């Protein structure tokens, strides 16, 4: 966590904000120390998916959880490594925080996150966001990195209906 890395992040976040219109807060970049580790946030999303699946909830609830994590980190500048970071997000998405905390701090929670990482690697994902299309057991890379919706639709259409 040095000035060069903070400068890199500031530049990247400004670029992403300019391209996507997504808001960013830069307060974390003023901190004298911050361990920029994405594993806890990834683990939290994996744990939320497990808990929501137990309750029979669908994936939109998991997407809401993910979106809230992104907002709280990138806009509000809170630290996702602390389990209490997720308390309000659990409340917003109907997840018991006590259940979440137990899973988040457990080996099973860490293994769930690792399984997600392993699955991404197996599919050839090396950066985020990545958009893949799977058809008849074959995967097609539509985008690696940000892509405007219209361009994504064009690539999907081209992949599904190649010219003959």
Predicted feature locations:
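C-terminal cap of thioredoxin/glutaredoxin-like
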Residues: 54, 68-164
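Structural alpha/beta surface segment adjacent to cysteine/selenocysteine redox centers
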Residues: 1-72
């Amino acid at each position: 966590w040095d000035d060069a890395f903070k400068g890199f992040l500031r530049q990247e976040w400004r670029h992403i904000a300019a391209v996507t219109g997504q808001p960013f807060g830069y307060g974390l970049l003023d901190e004298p120390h911050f361990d920029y580790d994405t594993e806890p946030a990834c683990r939290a999303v994996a744990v939320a998916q497990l808990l929501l699946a137990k309750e029979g909830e669908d994936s939109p609830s998991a997407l809401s959880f993910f979106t809230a994590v992104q907002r709280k980190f990138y806009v509000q500048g809170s630290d996702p490594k602390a389990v209490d970071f997720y308390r309000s997000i659990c409340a917003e998405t109907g997840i018991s925080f006590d259940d979440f905390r137990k899973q988040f701090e457990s080996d099973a929670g860490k293994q769930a996150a690792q399984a997600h990482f392993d699955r991404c690697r197996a599919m050839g994902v090396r950066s985020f966001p990545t958009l893949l299309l799977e058809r008849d057991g074959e995967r097609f890379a539509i985008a690696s990195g940000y892509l405007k919706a219209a361009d994504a639709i064009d690539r999907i259409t081209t992949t599904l209906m190649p010219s003959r």
